[in-house]
Amino acid sequence: MTFDPFVDRQYSKNTLLKFGGYHMSLAPGKYVYKNRYKKELLGYKKYYNDLTKVIKYFNFLPFDEVLEFETKIAEAIINHYSDKERDIRIPLDEFLSRYQGFDWITYFKALNVKNYSDNLSLEYPKIYQEIFKVIGEKDTMWLKKYLAWRFVNSVAKYASPKLNSIHHSFYWKVLKRQDIFKYIPGYNLLNIDKTFLGVLATREYEKYFINEEIKADFLNVIEYIRNSFIKQLDDLTWLNVSKDKIKHRLEKITFNISNQKYVKSYSKINFDENNYLKNIMTLRRINLDERFSNIGKTLKKDNWFSSSGFRTYASNSFLTSEQYYSAAYLQYPLYNLKMSFYEKVCAIGFIIAHEFAHNFDPNGILYDENNNKNLILSKDEYREYKKLIKSLKKQIDNYRIKDKTPFRGKIQICEVMSDLIAFKVILKALKEDGYTSKEDIENIIDRFAKTFACTQSVDSLLKNSNSCHPLQEVRVNLVLSNIDDFYDIFDVQPQDKMYVASEDRCRIWPN
């Protein structure tokens, strides 16, 4: 667990208020590491020094033994409960980002877990089998081990609160029996970092999912979304004098499929497949030293982003006019080369449109067409803009789950608003292309909802309610509650929970 002001989204309240949000691309160009971070970094430095003692123990421990140890713990936990309580809930997001290439169905069956694929398409394992056809067995052994480890390490995370609680209790009873873990009480030794192997996994992963034909096809979908945004600018009655500046900003955006441009070079590290933890700690030491060296220095525009291509990750940078889409998105159900163009727009198109829409959220408008932190709207436009989004903030604040309202419009407005604008842009574009029947619109709504579908428990979701990305349920329901067509297609009435009066719906973008 490291402190990283760029990557870690769980900022403190003061930091949040200062920088206006959690979204990574909000970091202003003159943002510097503050000295107040130095104390925390020094604390973590001691933590890593302690871990070097642990490394000595693992120097001669093959990764297979570590994995076997973790697997036994996971099996003991799962087998301790009834079939009903074995319903391990896996969100689509987590599945895409962590289990690429791993035969998870076979693994679940081996653990005797029930209901493992209720809401996930069985197409996934077929795709993974195809990956391994083009990668040699020897080359993928470390990847399989890594992915299996990531799964075992997160078995209880998406289970019931009871299972999650007992998991940690049982887990640490086991670990405390081993003196080696006394150096890091209360912390999962194996959950140190995944970036290094993530980079390696990315290289193998992209061999299958990225080729010139797929890139060209994906860029066609991106251009369709971009042109739809530019065309619909003329429909924004609140936008007048700044229209050309925003159009210019949209036109200059470039795209990066996969993150090879931003991956740091770890070429000096000799990867040892039998010394997993040593690899991780070497990488961690490099990253930690780099953070110390950056204290007091200005953030470079080309150093704002870091991720692994095998995770589902998309982003829009206001500082560089760049969008990034990880290779993990380029697979079913979000994308497949054989899909019709309409299907692609209804699937991966929502992800793309969401990133474009960030240019219109409360943080995106703070940057001008030259990527400087300078309000791009006129004073009159900005005044009208704030009026138009006020109702959406209120809806977020009042949204209830299990009789709770744990959401804050001030934090989550950027993501919900980007979802709303993205949906409206796609709906209008497809209507203009002839998809106007009731069945067409119902299908567009259905595809949008499925983009956020998951089987994660509500209690698990509520733990992340302070994130800038609200719960999947919130993102879908709040968007559709502000879509006029939704009321017509599904005959939504005032007594229905999702009903929002017409005059209270957010009209930041025309229907």
Where in the sequence are the language-model features?
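Intrinsically disordered, low-complexity linker/terminal regions across diverse proteins
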Residues: F63, K72, A76, D87-I105, ...
